[in-house]
Amino acid sequence: MSANALLKRGSLAFGAIGVAAVLYRRMLRGAILNWGATDGEAHARLPGDELLEQADGIATRAITIDAPASAVWPWIAQIGPSPRGGAYTYDWIENLLGLNMHSTDRVLPAYQHPQIGDVLGYGKNRMRFERVEPRRVLASRSEDGNWVWSFVLDERNGQTRLISRNRFRLPSLSAKIGMVPMEPASLVMERKMLHGIKQRAERLAATRPYAALPPPSTQGSERSSWQSPGASSSSLPT
């Protein structure tokens, strides 16, 4: 094959990649990053955002759970690698990455009172709890400060809106390139996680009186005045 033919093929390949990238950003990226979230939730300033003000990317995913926050919080509180409760997603994928996740269907009393400063994970995957409001907010930040992951619970009329917000900074070109396949991959994992929490919380609420759930600890936590988008409404998105 001649040099001109190779150059032409290379130009066509780069052109196709460029077109695919534009189509992805314009047509698919918003749906992937904001699965399940309303426009108000996707654009709202949520608790935990203050931990990484200048973010290169934001993902906001959400689900409505037919259970009160008291039945949802236990699964959020104990999230994390073994011996904690896992991430309620595809464990086999997590463990291929060496994350030591084993999702449990049980509430683990030893991990029901997360504290600011608690550390999850190992090495470069370490996350530290930075904001804890029992039954309302759990926000953690990576050790390098480039990733913040927040769970926000909004309860109304016995239902809970669970919002998962990821804010991330991409300080290098390799990080930016690596994020392209990570965005759809993270949707696969996080969608499974949100449904996993929903199933566990609804089962817990159906089999156990709400009042019997462990009371929240206020030690090492703070309370915000945040109100969710549409807080004036008595109903949550379906």
Where are these regions (language model features)?
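Short, charged/polar surface micro-motifs in flexible loops or helix N-caps
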Residues: 70, 81-82, 134-137, 146
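Membrane-penetrating hydrophobic segments
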Residues: 1-13
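Short, surface-exposed coil-to-beta transition loops
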Residues: 58-59, 124-125, 146-150
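Long, non-transmembrane cytosolic or organellar matrix-exposed soluble domains/tails
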Residues: 160-169, 182-238
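Short, hydrophobic/aromatic-rich segments at coil-to-beta transitions
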Residues: 113, 117, 131-140
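Beta-strand/loop substructures that line and gate deep hydrophobic ligand-binding cavities in soluble
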Residues: 35, 42, 141-199
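A short, structured loop/turn motif at beta-sheet edges
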Residues: 66-70, 131-135, 152-161, 201-205
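Hydrophobic ligand-binding cavity/cleft-lining segments
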Residues: 12, 18-116, 206-231, 236-238
